[in-house]
């Protein structure tokens, strides 16, 4: 059997600058939208002809921020608290023999401008700059299975956490909402999902976490089931 070499056909632009803040599913953070940019020679209008007639897409992508090495036959899914093991092929874990992922996303617009092609998407669960290897239309009658059994992922995700902003964080966000109109709402949506690793969730801690969203470093802590957004700092670009 011959090995297969893949080349990216596109990259995706998202607000998530690191994997720590990425939601676990694409529909959890409504304001966390993305844009797929097709790369040459695949940025031809002919390649996306008719795509606008579909409301949703499948993206096949690379977990490019995962350190590659010897794969393990079992993994610890976050939905099981990060403590119970299942087979790697019975999970959607990022650490896989081949670092490929599959994501269903909403297609909002196909834009062809100045020789470039952009696919404007709804909520996504991918890190900024993630390589895309293929794009396929979601076909409802074939892809939807209402009676499917999903083992440990059958139930919906836990209740969202309450999010509060310090006065300092509120002030910082307000100053930047002309450029990022929904910044406060977006940060709230990310934090209420509890971005911490599964094994840390539900445990008391005074630790202050930080994550990069757009061009901001967002600092926060969790106490008694409430997320407190402590600080929002604009990240200085390298000169």
Curated annotation (Swiss-Prot):
Q: What terms describe the molecular function in GO for this protein? A: tRNA (L-threonylcarbamoyladenosine(37)-C2) methyltransferase activity; tRNA binding
Q: What EC number(s) does the entry state?
A: 2.1.1.-
* Binding-site residues, S-adenosyl-L-methionine: 23-25, 64-65, 92, 102, 127-130
UniProt catalytic activity: N(6)-L-threonylcarbamoyladenosine(37) in tRNA + S-adenosyl-L-methionine = N(6)-methyl,N(6)-L-threonylcarbamoyladenosine(37) in tRNA + S-adenosyl-L-homocysteine + H(+)
A GO BP annotation: tRNA methylation
The UniProt keywords, alphabetically, are: Methyltransferase, RNA-binding, S-adenosyl-L-methionine, Transferase, tRNA processing
Task: Tell me the CDD domains matching this sequence.
Answer: UPF0066
Q: Which InterPro entries match?
A: TrmO-like_N, TrmO_C, UPF0066_cons_site, YaeB-like, YaeB-like_sf, YaeB_N_sf
What does the UniProt function comment say about this protein? S-adenosyl-L-methionine-dependent methyltransferase responsible for the addition of the methyl group in the formation of N6-methyl-N6-threonylcarbamoyladenosine at position 37 (m(6)t(6)A37) of the tRNA anticodon loop of tRNA(Thr)(GGU). The methyl group of m(6)t(6)A37 appears to slightly improve the efficiency of the tRNA decoding ability. Binds to tRNA.
Q: Quaternary structure per UniProt?
A: Homodimer.
The name on file for this protein is tRNA (adenine(37)-N6)-methyltransferase
Q: Which organism is it from?
A: Haemophilus influenzae (strain ATCC 51907 / DSM 11121 / KW20 / Rd)
Gene, per the UniProt record: trmO
């Amino acid at each position: 059997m011959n090995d297969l070499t893949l080349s990216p056909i596109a990259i995706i632009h998202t607000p998530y600058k690191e994997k720590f803040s990425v939601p676990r599913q694409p529909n959890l953070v409504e304001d966390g939208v993305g844009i797929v940019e097709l790369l040459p020679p695949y940025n031809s209008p002919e390649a996306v002809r008719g795509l606008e007639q579909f409301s949703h897409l499948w993206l096949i992508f690379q977990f490019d921020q995962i350190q590659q090495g010897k794969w393990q036959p079992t993994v610890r899914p976050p939905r099981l608290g990060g403590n119970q093991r299942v087979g790697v092929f019975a999970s959607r874990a990022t650490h896989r023999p081949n670092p490929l992922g599959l994501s269903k996303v909403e297609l909002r617009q196909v834009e062809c401008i100045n020789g470039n092609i952009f696919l404007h998407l709804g909520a996504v669960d991918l890190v900024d700059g993630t390589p895309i290897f293929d794009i396929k239309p979601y076909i409802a009658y074939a892809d939807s299975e209402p009676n499917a059994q999903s083992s440990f992922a059958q139930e919906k995700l836990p209740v969202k956490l309450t999010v509060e902003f310090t006065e300092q964080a509120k002030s910082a966000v307000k100053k930047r909402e002309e450029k990022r109109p929904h910044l406060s709402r977006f940060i709230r949506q990310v934090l209420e999902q509890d971005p911490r690793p599964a094994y840390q969730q539900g445990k008391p801690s005074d630790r202050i976490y930080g994550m990069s969203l757009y061009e901001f470093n967002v600092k926060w802590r969790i106490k008694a089931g409430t997320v407190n957004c402590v600080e929002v700092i604009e990240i200085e670009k390298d000169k």
